[in-house]
């Protein structure tokens, strides 16, 4: 395909136009008085959102240079969303301010590489200042306030704080769509996985269609169980103990299944058979998680264990097991606390090293099942469009709350960034590096100015006033008051704020050092096909 090339100022200005097109659409959503953006979909109802990354992902520009500029800023929003789960609009606003100020200096003759070094040193200093000023999140109220700001709804913040209180900081909080109006919180104690009983004959509570086993033994097998002679020696030992048995295996079928069912119906022996969750290596890992949680061992030929020679000492234990048609919950496994912590640390290390979003999500679920629990927030709304928008806001707020617990919080509303600008005085830079640091100083006020603008206030006046207030005091855009923001519950996770600045600066530095852009030449539309009759009109058939 033919390419088109632009150089120098033309190249940089083309990229900047693309950046501005995207940033101008995103920045109207910033702050408590930010507006929404409607996104048209090829199929189905349009989406209404105030989430920066969702808007950025939808924008495709026609001009090849502008398209590349917009794609670079999308990267800022996506990276910030991946790392911190929020702050995508702030990152976009910062990137726009850094690029605008930087290109002005490049056009005036500054050396782009000198500016880049200055920007990097200034960002490092501001990040250090932000982390030093961060306050640890210690109370449920602080989590509720932070999540409430992210979602733009305090009731959502309260519910997320309640969920985190119940399942712990490592627990998983999932958001589901509900048919009923409003918000509900459901909590799961113990380990739950999405596999139910193999046969309906195992049910012990006919009304609720559940099989409930009190203080059972748990047999974990990595292969299929089909012949009864493999299972019989172990079954006899379990029957002698008088305890029920939960079997989790790749599958339980044939005479092994019918033997268990017949004994259950006759009342001789209570048991439930369940298929192991997952596939392949993930199934093996989840069985191992269950073994550690219940204090048992996975019976597998890989480790030299077989069903015929298995003993009761290889079985896991739990206080209670509840099995429904679709899921199994193991409550209070009898595993060793130290072994569980070791497994948790191992999974956490795998999460750090994983570069696949899907793998990371699955590992996170396994971690939650071992370390905490699972909370489900069910969100309902009047229309499908509102429901999607609400669900998205809650998911963002959950990640925001987790980021707050991880690294602490700073004053929100763009104030922490603006008030960290004086720390740049400590840098002893000269020439273009000093100019680069000054570009960052100017850009640090951009989020606050945009929040003020969206709230109908004069940006310059607000920024000037806030820069002269004590640390942590600033504009609460929701009320229009100047106050101690942390005390008023206006806080941002420092992880979100620093990620937004670091990612914006990274892309801005690339913009400034760009000297040529190579893009695909737009294809000309094909000429309309000619008259297939060759223009021989007037012939009468």
Curated annotation (Swiss-Prot):
Catalytic activity: ATP + H2O + a folded polypeptide = ADP + phosphate + an unfolded polypeptide
Subunit field text: Forms a cylinder of 14 subunits composed of two heptameric rings stacked back-to-back. Interacts with the co-chaperonin GroES.
EC nos: 5.6.1.7
InterPro entries for this protein: Chaperonin_Cpn60_CS, Cpn60/GroEL, Cpn60/GroEL/TCP-1, GroEL-like_apical_dom_sf, GROEL-like_equatorial_sf, TCP-1-like_intermed_sf
Family per record: Belongs to the chaperonin (HSP60) family.
Record key words, sorted: ATP-binding, Cell wall, Chaperone, Isomerase, Isopeptide bond, Nucleotide-binding, Secreted, Ubl conjugation
Protein purpose: Together with its co-chaperonin GroES, plays an essential role in assisting protein folding. The GroEL-GroES system forms a nano-cage that allows encapsulation of the non-native substrate proteins and provides a physical environment optimized to promote and accelerate protein folding.
Binding locations of ATP: 29-32, 86-90, 413, 476-478, 492
Upper lineage: Bacteria, Bacillati, Actinomycetota, Actinomycetes, Mycobacteriales
Cross-link Isoglutamyl lysine isopeptide (Lys-Gln) (interchain with Q-Cter in protein Pup) placement: 132
Name of the protein described by the UniProt record: Chaperonin GroEL 2
Protein's organism: Mycolicibacterium smegmatis (strain ATCC 700084 / mc(2)155)
Keyword Ubl conjugation appears in the UniProt entry: yes
UniProt keyword annotation of Transmembrane present: no
Pfam families from the UniProt entry: Cpn60_TCP1
């Amino acid at each position: 395909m033919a390419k088109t090339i632009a150089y120098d100022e033309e190249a940089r200005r083309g990229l900047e136009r693309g950046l501005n097109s995207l940033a101008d659409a995103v920045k109207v959503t910033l702050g408590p008085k930010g507006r929404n953006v409607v996104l048209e979909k090829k199929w189905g109802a349009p989406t209404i959102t105030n989430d920066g990354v969702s808007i950025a992902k939808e924008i495709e520009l026609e001009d090849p240079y502008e398209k590349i500029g917009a794609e670079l800023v999308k990267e800022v929003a996506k990276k910030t969303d991946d790392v911190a789960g929020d702050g995508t609009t702030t990152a976009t606003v910062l990137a726009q301010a850094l690029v605008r100020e930087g290109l002005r200096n490049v056009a005036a003759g500054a050396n782009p590489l000198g500016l880049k070094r200055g920007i990097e040193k200034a960002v490092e200093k501001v990040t250090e200042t932000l982390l030093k000023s961060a306050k640890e999140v210690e109370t449920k109220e602080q989590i509720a306030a932070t999540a409430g700001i992210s979602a733009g709804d305090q009731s959502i913040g309260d519910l997320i704080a309640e969920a985190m209180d119940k399942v712990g900081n490592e627990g998983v909080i999932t958001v589901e769509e509900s048919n009923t109006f409003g918000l509900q919180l459901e909590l799961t104690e113990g380990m739950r996985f999405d596999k139910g009983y193999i046969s309906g004959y195992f049910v012990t509570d006919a009304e609720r269609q559940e099989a409930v086993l009190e203080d059972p033994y748990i047999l974990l097998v990595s292969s299929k169980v089909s012949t009864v002679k493999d299972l019989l020696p172990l079954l006899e030992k379990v029957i002698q103990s008088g305890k029920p048995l939960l079997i989790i295996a790749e599958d339980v079928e044939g005479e092994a299944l019918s033997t268990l069912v017949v004994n259950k119906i006759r009342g001789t022996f209570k048991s439930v058979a369940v298929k192991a969750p997952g596939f392949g290596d993930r199934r093996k890992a989840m069985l191992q998680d269950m073994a550690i949680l219940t204090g048992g061992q996975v019976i597998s030929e890989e480790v030299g264990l077989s069903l015929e020679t298995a003993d009761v000492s290889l079985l896991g234990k739990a206080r209670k097991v509840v099995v429904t048609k679709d899921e199994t919950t193991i409550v209070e496994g009898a595993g060793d606390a130290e072994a569980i912590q070791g497994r948790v640390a191992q999974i956490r290390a795998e999460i750090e090293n994983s570069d696949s979003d899907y793998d990371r999500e699955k590992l996170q679920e396994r971690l939650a099942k071992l370390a905490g629990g699972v909370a489900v927030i069910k969100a309902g709304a009047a229309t499908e469009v509102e429901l999607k928008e609400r669900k998205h806001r809650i998911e963002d707020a959950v990640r925001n709350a987790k980021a707050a617990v991880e690294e602490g919080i700073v004053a929100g509303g763009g104030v922490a960034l603006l008030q960290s600008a004086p720390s740049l005085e400590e840098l002893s830079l000269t020439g273009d590096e000093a100019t680069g640091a000054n570009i960052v100083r100017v850009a640090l006020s951009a989020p606050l100015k945009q929040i003020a603008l969206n709230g109908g206030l004069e940006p310059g006046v607000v920024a000037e006033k806030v820069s002269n207030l004590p640390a942590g005091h600033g504009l609460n855009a929701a009320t229009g008051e100047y106050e101690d923001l942390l005390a008023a519950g206006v806080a941002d996770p420092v992880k979100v704020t620093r990620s937004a600045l670091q990612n914006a600066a990274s892309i801005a530095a690339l913009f400034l050092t760009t000297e040529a852009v190579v893009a695909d030449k737009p294809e000309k539309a094909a000429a309309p096909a000619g008259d297939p009759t060759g223009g021989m009109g007037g012939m009468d058939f």
